[in-house]
């Protein structure tokens, strides 16, 4: 009976780890057809009206320039002009398809992540007792570690998150989140987040060491600073 009770929180933790992947897989399959039909039937004509408007305008200006070029080369043979017009027509259709696929992709991924967040929040709320048990296990495990191992683990974690080489890792992580939500890659926003987020984490971590670790385990703080130096 005790083993069964101990297995339940472990199963709950495993389900939390794999549940987002299952939700994402199911939602992508079930929502993609509905969102595609909704977009293609133009029910979303007022939705995302201003998003990418500038980019769309620039693309059509480029196409307009191509048509102006068409007028400039009328002295070319008629067969070449027909091929030229056909090429412009194909490029226009291709651009419209890419534009629609981008918005469908954005709506799909944003909806999937929102649904995953709601389901996981409800799942975590109804499983608070199991989370408390898992938390007690983690605290007991950390308490049994020596101060040297704790200091080494903290130093390793901080070097990975806010160390010298951490910006590249943050760039990959934030870029993955952007891609997962279906957003376009904006270099300026990405650079701003990469340059500020580790600094904020570093400040929070130093405050945590000063307020919490100094009160709970002063020896751990001494060992941490000794290893860090």
Curated annotation (Swiss-Prot):
One of its GO terms (cellular component) is chloroplast inner membrane. Keywords: Antiport, Chloroplast, Hydrogen ion transport, Ion transport, Membrane, Plastid, Plastid inner membrane, Potassium, Potassium transport, Transmembrane, Transmembrane helix, Transport. Its main location: plastid. GO terms for biological process: potassium ion transport. Pfam families: CemA. It catalyses: K(+)(in) + H(+)(out) = K(+)(out) + H(+)(in). Coiled coil: none annotated. InterPro entries: CemA. The chain crosses the membrane at residues 6-26, 107-127, 189-209. It is a multi-pass membrane protein. GO terms for molecular function: antiporter activity; proton transmembrane transporter activity. It is found in: Plastid, Chloroplast inner membrane. Contributes to K(+)/H(+) antiport activity by supporting proton efflux to control proton extrusion and homeostasis in chloroplasts in a light-dependent manner to modulate photosynthesis. Prevents excessive induction of non-photochemical quenching (NPQ) under continuous-light conditions. Indirectly promotes efficient inorganic carbon uptake into chloroplasts. Belongs to the CemA family. This is Potassium/proton antiporter CemA. It comes from Draba nemorosa (Woodland whitlowgrass). The lineage of its organism: Eukaryota, Viridiplantae, Streptophyta, Embryophyta, Tracheophyta.
């Amino acid at each position: 009976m005790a083993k069964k009770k101990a297995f339940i929180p472990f199963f709950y933790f495993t389900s939390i780890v794999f549940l987002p992947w299952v939700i994402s897989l199911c939602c992508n399959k079930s929502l993609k057809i509905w969102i595609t039909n909704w977009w293609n039937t133009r029910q979303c004509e007022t939705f995302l009206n201003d998003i990418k408007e500038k980019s769309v305008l620039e693309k059509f200006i480029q196409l307009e320039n191509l048509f102006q070029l068409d007028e400039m080369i009328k002295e070319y043979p008629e067969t070449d002009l027909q091929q030229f017009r056909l090429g412009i027509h194909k490029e226009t259709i291709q651009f419209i398809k890419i534009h629609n696929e981008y918005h469908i992709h954005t709506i799909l991924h944003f909806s999937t992540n929102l649904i995953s967040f709601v389901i996981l929040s409800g799942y975590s709320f109804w499983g608070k007792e199991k989370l408390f048990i898992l938390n007690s296990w983690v605290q007991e495990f950390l308490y049994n570690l020596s101060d040297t191992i704790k200091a080494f683990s903290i130093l390793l974690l901080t070097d990975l998150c806010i160390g010298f080489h951490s910006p590249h890792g943050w760039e990959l992580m934030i870029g993955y989140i952007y891609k997962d939500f279906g957003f376009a890659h904006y270099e300026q926003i990405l650079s701003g987040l990469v340059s500020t987020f580790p600094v904020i984490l570093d400040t929070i971590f130093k405050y945590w060491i000063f307020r919490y670790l100094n009160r709970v385990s002063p020896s751990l703080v001494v060992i941490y600073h000794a290893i860090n130096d």
